[in-house]
């Protein structure tokens, strides 16, 4: 799976969870500051992405994933 494919999958998951248009979800966007996600929504997205990619994202790592790009890079290392 390429980085671009991961980004598309993450964009779709984030857009669905937050009720945003996929075009609003770019790698540079911060979940909390730019996309308005609260802590619960971020944790739910992490769980959704764990299921989608069949990976485990440790809690201490999840806390460091501030942007969409951070998540894509992290998932890339786990695949």
Swiss-Prot record:
PTM entry text: 4'-phosphopantetheine is transferred from CoA to a specific serine of apo-ACP by AcpS. This modification is essential for activity because fatty acids are bound in thioester linkage to the sulfhydryl of the prosthetic group.
Keyword Repeat attached: no
InterPro entries linked: ACP, ACP-like_sf, PP-bd_ACP, Ppantetheine_attach_site
Principal subcellular localization: cytoplasm
Carrier domain boundaries: 4-79
GO biological process, one term: lipid A biosynthetic process
A Pfam family that the UniProt record links to this protein: PP-binding
Biological or metabolic pathway of the protein: Lipid metabolism; fatty acid biosynthesis
GO CC aspect terms: cytosol; membrane
NCBIfam families per the UniProt record, alphabetical: acyl_carrier, PRK00982.1-2, PRK00982.1-4
Annotated family: Belongs to the acyl carrier protein (ACP) family.
Function: Carrier of the growing fatty acid chain in fatty acid biosynthesis.
Protein name: Acyl carrier protein
Species of origin: Exiguobacterium sp. (strain ATCC BAA-1283 / AT1b)
């Amino acid at each position: 799976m390429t980085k671009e494919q991961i980004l598309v999958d993450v964009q779709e998951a984030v857009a669905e969870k937050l009720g945003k248009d996929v075009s609003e979800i770019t790698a540079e966007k911060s979940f909390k500051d730019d996309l308005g996600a609260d802590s619960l929504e971020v944790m739910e997205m992490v769980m959704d992405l764990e299921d989608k990619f069949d990976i485990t994202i440790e809690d201490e790592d999840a806390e460091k994933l501030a942007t969409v790009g951070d998540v894509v890079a992290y998932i890339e290392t786990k695949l």
